[in-house]
């Protein structure tokens, strides 16, 4: 039985780089590649069909990888919740690192890179499951009385004697 085919969306600044990456990724038999010219086209596609991974570019002026990742993570209409994002960057600065962490980018690959290296990283990223971040919840008040008299509440407001 063949492994399921995974969908990879590619959105980079340079059309030549986009075609090279798309052609190289399409060489892997387990990948279906969808290149996009604009962020709007990518978002529209993701509303209609799920993708497993997005390759984005930090050098893309209209849609930087961190802004794209924030939009993808914040959009509840996108069907795939475990969407992974790989960003391509020509320079890795502290600002780029912080923006990537804040936006939820899973991996950064430095340009120039070998297209084969990108294929290896995409396949490795798709092979392991994405760990979903826990949802933030409000603090619960715990009733410690069920543990008996041995539990001493440290932060209970007691009237002064």
Predicted regions and their residues:
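Conserved acidic segment of CheY-like receiver
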Residues: 2-16, 21-25, 35, 54-55
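Short hydrophobic/Thr-rich beta-strand motif most characteristic of the beta2 strand and flanking loop
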Residues: 30-38, 45
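Conserved phosphotransfer microenvironments
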Residues: 48, 52-81
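A short, hydrophobic beta-strand element within the central beta-sheet of small alpha/beta folds
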Residues: 54, 79-94
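C-terminal output helix
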Residues: 113-122
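CheY-like receiver
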Residues: 128-161
């Amino acid at each position: 039985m063949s492994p399921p085919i995974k969908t990879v969306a590619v959105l980079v600044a340079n059309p030549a780089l986009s075609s090279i990456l798309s052609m190289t990724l399409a060489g892997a038999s387990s990948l279906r590649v969808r290149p996009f010219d604009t962020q709007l086209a990518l978002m529209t596609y993701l509303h209609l069909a799920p993708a497993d991974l997005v390759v984005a570019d930090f050098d893309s002026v209209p849609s930087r990888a961190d802004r794209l990742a924030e939009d993808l993570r914040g959009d509840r209409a996108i069907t795939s919740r475990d969407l992974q994002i790989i960003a391509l960057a020509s320079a890795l600065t502290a600002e780029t690192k912080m923006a990537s962490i804040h936006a939820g980018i899973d991996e950064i690959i430095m340009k120039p890179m070998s297209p084969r290296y990108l294929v290896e990283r995409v396949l490795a990223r798709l092979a392991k499951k994405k760990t979903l971040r826990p949802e933030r919840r409000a603090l619960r008040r715990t009733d410690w009385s069920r543990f008996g008299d041995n539990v001493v509440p440290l932060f209970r407001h007691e009237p002064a004697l």
